Structure formats: structure tokens, C-alpha cells
Amino acid sequence: MANIKSQIKRNRTNKKAQERNKAVKSELKTAIRATREAVATGDKEKASSALRLASKKLDKAASKGVIHKNQAANRKSAIAKQVAAL
């Protein structure tokens, strides 16, 4: 346990950020999974709308600093490639 006042506050803010980042990453995984499932079923309409949502969430996570912008770009291109193959 930290004794310094500033470190106690940092621990508190780090915990909040960790919970927020965990929630965002969970949403990302769900959105990407939904896109991949739509691709697996062969539903082009559903896949393209899921891709749009996943891309939006990836961009938002990258802008907030939850994931790196290059990682967001790589994930977007990977799922876009799968949707385009339909």
C-alpha cells in the first residue's frame, strides 16, 4: 500500500483507467466477433453493417489511446478483407 498522497491518487486513477480500457477492449472483441460471425454465415448486409460498427469502435479506441493506431488499422484491414471476400 502506498503511503505518498500523490501515489494513492495515481493508484485510484490507474484503476479507473484500467476498468475503462477493459470495457472498451471487451466491446472491440464483441464487435469484431460479430463481424466474423456474419462473414461465416455469408450474410453480406449484416457483415458490412457489423464492419462499419467495428471500424468505428476501433478508431475510437485508437483515438482514446486504448490500442495503438497501427493495431487498429491492422484489425480493420483484416476484417475488411474478410467482408470483401464475400
From Swiss-Prot:
<dbReference type="GO" id="GO:0003735">
    <property type="term" value="F:structural constituent of ribosome"/>
</dbReference>
<comment type="similarity">
    <text>Belongs to the bacterial ribosomal protein bS20 family.</text>
</comment>
<keyword id="KW-0699">rRNA-binding</keyword>
<keyword id="KW-0687">Ribonucleoprotein</keyword>
<dbReference type="GO" id="GO:0015935">
    <property type="term" value="C:small ribosomal subunit"/>
</dbReference>
<comment type="function">
    <text>Binds directly to 16S ribosomal RNA.</text>
</comment>
<protein>
    <recommendedName>
        <fullName>Small ribosomal subunit protein bS20</fullName>
    </recommendedName>
</protein>
<dbReference type="InterPro" id="IPR002583">
    <property type="entry name" value="Ribosomal_bS20"/>
</dbReference>
<dbReference type="GO" id="GO:0070181">
    <property type="term" value="F:small ribosomal subunit rRNA binding"/>
</dbReference>
<keyword id="KW-0689">Ribosomal protein</keyword>
<dbReference type="Pfam" id="PF01649">
    <property type="entry name" value="Ribosomal_S20p"/>
</dbReference>
<dbReference type="GO" id="GO:0006412">
    <property type="term" value="P:translation"/>
</dbReference>
<keyword id="KW-0694">RNA-binding</keyword>
<dbReference type="GO" id="GO:0005829">
    <property type="term" value="C:cytosol"/>
</dbReference>
<feature type="compositionally biased region" description="Basic and acidic residues">
    <location>
        <begin position="16"/>
        <end position="27"/>
    </location>
</feature>
<dbReference type="InterPro" id="IPR036510">
    <property type="entry name" value="Ribosomal_bS20_sf"/>
</dbReference>
<feature type="region of interest" description="Disordered">
    <location>
        <begin position="1"/>
        <end position="27"/>
    </location>
</feature>
